[in-house]
């Protein structure tokens, strides 16, 4: 293992690393963040020529190419094409103009594209340094893993490289959903804590939270059958869970959601919304013909019409109580003493790359997210889920660094994949499931879809393979049809419906976030369809024959497709799915023009395969013994899900995340 010295840590050989990612990419928890060496000044003497710098953006390697005369910048090309289309990718022209006008890397950036802007600044800084003849740094990343070894090796950092020390009682790593909720609870209790986050802002809020017998249920007189719920969670996981961990969520989530309410409603006036009754369940008719499911009334969200986001309000909450987040500070490694207790971490500034020791007297909580943005981990830990995925709706910064850091310290990773796959990965005809090569994406691979989620894809319309054949009962939880497609050509499938799409969706009555298709009305569904049509992924035709052509069906496959639609109409007329047993209320006619068709695979939201924990939220080692001083929550925690995500329990993952965030703080602070 190579030691990283203060002067030499940036000069690690790049052969095993990904090009375009810098040593500053020891993400606070799992994202890559880039860095260059010397700071470049505004004015000065340059060596005429063209220079290129790269840095990691939110989801890709950003490239800046600058041309210099002996005294000025004469041309700038900014390539952010791999960033989020409507944000970072769209900001390239404005960032280019800012660099030209400033004549330096000291620019304002573009609002809403902070991470991309920061990457452009760092890449530009490298160009200026090269033009001035100053030392520049080869872009490398400390341990990335690779295509055969996703884990890699823990960095060995010289004491001399650590130039700052911070002492605290509780350290929270990651300012996402779990980390910010833990911080809010700790702030409310007046505890001594710090939060670090590798990005420059809090991370995206997942708005739907699952809580058992919370205030909404109490107001409606609803009482959960907790034993049945425990059994159902275990059934989803095929028994590959720790039921004591599940019970912590079941028994303590009511207190969690009450604390959420106290901040959202009482403090900031944002109304909480509880979903219950028929709205929370599939129609009873489903059980007459199909395997039935449990539909626990656990879902809470809040009024977002004002633009409120929970994580941003939690940041405001802790700031008002005198706390804050150490942004642009990333996890490098955990530290432990001779007794094996986790005593803190070594972190790294993503601004100037100096190392910081955080001593945590009472414990460390890792709340770092999963690994959906890391193709090395996805392909090696979940080859099946990867193979059926066509689009992504995850946070690109979730690259599994927190999981890897915990494992380097001796923690035990769940052995079963548990991806959160939604059947909404819309793509153009001819596109297969799985990664495609990408010069700008982390690891050189990306999923091909350009739309994060096509929500109508969850509706149980007719679905066929590339041969035009129906192959499954389409009335199922979100991930069932995408796994069924793993056995079909290209691992994708086509969805077909007619002009009555909204009327059919209302009758289908799907639940959870897929209910947006029916509850959003014509304006919502038309917006989703227009977006997909513009992207060349959804087709609208006056005849089924024309639709078949647009969808790419030819020869025998086209004949089979048209025959399959005719057969499906017969089954609708009979109100009896003789072929696959779909409940009658979820059959639909395909007779009224215009007709719509698209190709779908999975949209990957996150991964739930994480570090094994006990009912207190403590990380477990490879002997399943608690690791003193280390707690885990969120998507990087395990012991709860396996194989899939129970999407008919809306909000269960976020409920688990917030419950164990609160639990960990209680444990570390000695509050229970």
Q: Model-predicted segments: where are they?
A:
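Active-site- and interface-proximal helix/loop "cap" or "latch" segments in soluble metabolic
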Residues: 41-143
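N-terminal secretory signal peptides and thylakoid transit peptides that target proteins
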Residues: 1-20, 24-28
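Conserved redox-cofactor binding core of oxidoreductases
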Residues: 206, 251-354, 375-376, 435-437, ...
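A glycine-rich dinucleotide-binding beta-alpha-beta segment and adjacent secondary-structure elements
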Residues: 333, 558-644
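Glycine-rich loop(s) and the adjacent beta-strand/alpha-helix scaffold that form part
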Residues: 351-354, 358-431, 648, 654-663
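An anion/pyrophosphate-binding glycine-rich loop and adjacent beta-alpha core
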Residues: 403-405, 412-553
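Glycine-rich FAD pyrophosphate-binding loop
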Residues: 188-206
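N-terminal Rossmann-like FAD-binding beta1-loop-alpha1 element of flavoenzymes
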Residues: 170-194
């Amino acid at each position: 293992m190579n030691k990283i010295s203060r002067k030499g840590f940036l000069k690690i050989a790049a052969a095993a690393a990904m090009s375009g990612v810098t040593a500053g990419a020891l993400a606070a928890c799992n994202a890559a963040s880039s860095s260059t060496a010397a700071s470049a000044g505004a004015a000065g003497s340059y060596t005429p020529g063209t220079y290129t710098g790269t840095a990691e953006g939110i989801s890709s390697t950003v490239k800046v190419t600058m041309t210099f005369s002996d005294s000025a910048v004469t041309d700038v090309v900014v390539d952010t094409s791999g960033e989020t289309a409507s944000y970072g990718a769209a900001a390239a022209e404005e960032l280019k103009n800012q660099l030209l006008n400033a004549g330096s890397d000291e620019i304002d950036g573009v609002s809403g594209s902070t991470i991309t802007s920061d990457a452009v600044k760092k890449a530009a800084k490298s160009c200026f340094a090269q033009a001035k003849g100053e030392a520049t740094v080869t872009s490398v990343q400390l341990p990335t893993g690779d295509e055969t070894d996703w884990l890699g090796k823990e960095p060995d950092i010289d004491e001399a490289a650590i130039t700052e020390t911070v002492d605290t009682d509780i350290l929270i790593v990651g300012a996402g959903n779990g980390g910010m909720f833990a911080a809010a609870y700790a702030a409310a209790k007046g505890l001594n804590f710090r939060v670090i986050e590798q990005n420059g802002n809090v991370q995206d809020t997942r708005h739907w939270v699952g809580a058992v017998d919370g205030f909404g249920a109490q107001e409606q007189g609803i009482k959960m059958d907790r034993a049945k719920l425990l059994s159902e969670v275990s059934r989803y996981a095929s028994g590959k869970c720790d039921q004591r961990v599940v019970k912590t969520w079941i028994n303590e989530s009511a207190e969690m959601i009450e604390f959420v309410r106290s901040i959202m409603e009482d403090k900031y006036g944002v109304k909480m919304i509880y979903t219950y009754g028929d709205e929370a369940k599939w129609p009873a008719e489903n059980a007459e013909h199909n395997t039935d499911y449990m539909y626990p009334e656990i879902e809470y969200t809040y009024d977002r019409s004002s633009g409120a986001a929970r994580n941003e309000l939690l940041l405001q909450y802790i700031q008002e109580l005198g706390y804050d987040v150490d942004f642009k500070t990333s996890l490098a490694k955990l530290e432990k003493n001779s007794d094996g207790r986790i005593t803190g971490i070594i972190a790294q500034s993503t601004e100037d790359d100096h190392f910081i020791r955080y001593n945590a007297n009472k414990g460390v909580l890792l709340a770092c997210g999963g690994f959906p943005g890391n193709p090395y981990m996805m392909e090696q830990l979940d080859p099946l889920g990867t193979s059926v995925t066509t689009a992504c709706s995850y946070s690109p910064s979730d690259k599994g660094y927190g999981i890897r850091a915990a494992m380097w310290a001796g923690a035990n990773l769940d052995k079963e994949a548990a991806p959160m796959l939604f059947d909404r990965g819309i793509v153009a005809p001819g596109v297969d499931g799985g990664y495609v090569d990408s010069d700008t994406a982390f690891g050189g691979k990306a999923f091909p879809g350009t739309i994060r989620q096509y929500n109508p894809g969850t509706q149980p319309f007719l679905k066929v393979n590339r041969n035009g054949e129906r192959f499954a009962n389409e009335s199922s939880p979100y991930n069932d049809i995408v796994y069924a497609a793993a056995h079909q050509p290209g691992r994708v499938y086509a969805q077909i419906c007619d002009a009555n799409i909204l009327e059919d969706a209302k009758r289908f009555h799907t639940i959870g976030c897929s209910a947006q298709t029916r509850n959003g009305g014509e304006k919502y569904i038309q917006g989703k369809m227009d977006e997909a049509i513009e992207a060349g992924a959804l087709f609208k035709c006056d005849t089924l024959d024309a639709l078949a052509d647009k969808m790419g069906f030819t020869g025998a496959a086209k004949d089979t497709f048209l025959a399959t639609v005719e057969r499906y109409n017969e089954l609708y007329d009979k109100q009896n799915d003789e072929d696959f047993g779909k409940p009658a209320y979820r059959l639909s006619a395909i007779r009224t023009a215009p007709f719509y068709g698209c190709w779908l695979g999975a949209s990957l939201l996150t991964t739930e395969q994480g570090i094994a924990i006990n009912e207190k939220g403590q990380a477990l080692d490879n002997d399943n013994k608690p690791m003193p001083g280390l707690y885990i929550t969120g998507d990087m925690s395990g012991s709860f899900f396996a194989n899939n995500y129970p999407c008919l329990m809306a909000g269960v993952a976020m409920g688990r995340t917030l419950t164990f965030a609160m639990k960990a703080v209680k444990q570390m602070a000695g509050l229970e």
